[in-house]
Swiss-Prot record:
Ferredoxins are iron-sulfur proteins that transfer electrons in a wide variety of metabolic reactions. SUPFAM superfamilies: 2Fe-2S ferredoxin-like (SSF54292). InterPro entries: 2Fe-2S_ferredoxin-like_sf (IPR036010), 2Fe-2S_ferredoxin-type (IPR001041), 2Fe2S_fd_BS (IPR006058), Beta-grasp_dom_sf (IPR012675), Fd_pln (IPR010241). Belongs to the 2Fe2S plant-type ferredoxin family. This is Ferredoxin-2. Its cofactor is [2Fe-2S] cluster. Residues 4-94 form the 2Fe-2S ferredoxin-type domain. It comes from the Eukaryota. GO terms for molecular function: 2 iron, 2 sulfur cluster binding; electron transfer activity; metal ion binding. Pfam families: Fer2. Keywords: 2Fe-2S, Chloroplast, Electron transport, Iron, Iron-sulfur, Metal-binding, Plastid, Transport. One of its GO terms (cellular component) is chloroplast stroma. It is found in: Plastid, Chloroplast. The lineage of its organism: Eukaryota, Viridiplantae, Streptophyta, Embryophyta, Tracheophyta.
Amino acid sequence: AASYKVTFVTPSGTKTITCPADTYVLDAAEDTGLDLPYSCRAGACSSCAGKVTAGSVNQEDGSFLDEEQMEAGWVLTCVAYPTSDVTIETHKEEDLSA
């Protein structure tokens, strides 16, 4: 499978990892020791919500976000596959529910 560079912008700094196209970005982050928020791991809540600021993801497996939210850049990292090099701001659940 292809791999992409995924950059996570977290409250404690920025980290770039390599994520295969068939791996959820949350799983890839955890494999490198990056501690990101999550709860259900099934795309059915907003605990892992982030914002895509560059690039693109496929999150068809998720159910919590609506079309408008996804078009605005919201992403559930637990069900997001990278489809290009992508930058994601993490720890955004409070902004999403605002």
